[in-house]
Amino acid sequence: MNYTILVTGPPYGTQNSSTAFLFCQSLLKTKHILHSVFFYCDGVLNANNMTTPAIDEFNLINAWQGLNKKHQVKLYVCNSAALRRGVIEDEKLFNMNVKKGNLALSFQLSGLIELAKSIKICDRIIQF
């Protein structure tokens, strides 16, 4: 089966994102196809490279990046939701008084059109 995952929860404070990550790992271990992960609403905070968990806590942002590197899973971040929550890529800074963006590597800003395309080609979409 071909899956798209929609993450709407932040990396910390709820279990949405960590459960989504564990589900993605399970999908890949059982040889399903994970087309993409789309971060929306507070889920865009998973792409904030300024998030710094305690040293003894699981670093979910690094885990998502590892999933991208190891399995080439696309990590899409809703552009509008990201801007509302202060997640900005370096290329968007020319209109703002900010020196450096905080969009983590491996994540890419996109619109809802990417989510729609993913839904169209996948067998299942699951929201966390």
From Swiss-Prot:
UniProt-recorded Gene Ontology molecular function terms: sulfur carrier activity; sulfurtransferase activity
| Species of the source | Buchnera aphidicola subsp. Acyrthosiphon pisum (strain APS) (Acyrthosiphon pisum symbiotic bacterium)
Annotated catalytic residues:
78
The protein in question is named Sulfurtransferase TusD
A GO CC annotation given for this chain: sulfurtransferase complex
Q: What Gene3D superfamilies does UniProt report for this protein, alphabetically?
A: DsrEFH-like (3.40.1260.10)
Q: Which InterPro entries match?
A: DsrEFH-like, Sulphur_relay_DsrE/F-like, Sulphur_relay_TusD/DsrE
Question: Quick one: which gene encodes this?
Answer: tusD
Q: Where in the cell is it found?
A: Cytoplasm
- Domain of life of the native organism: Bacteria
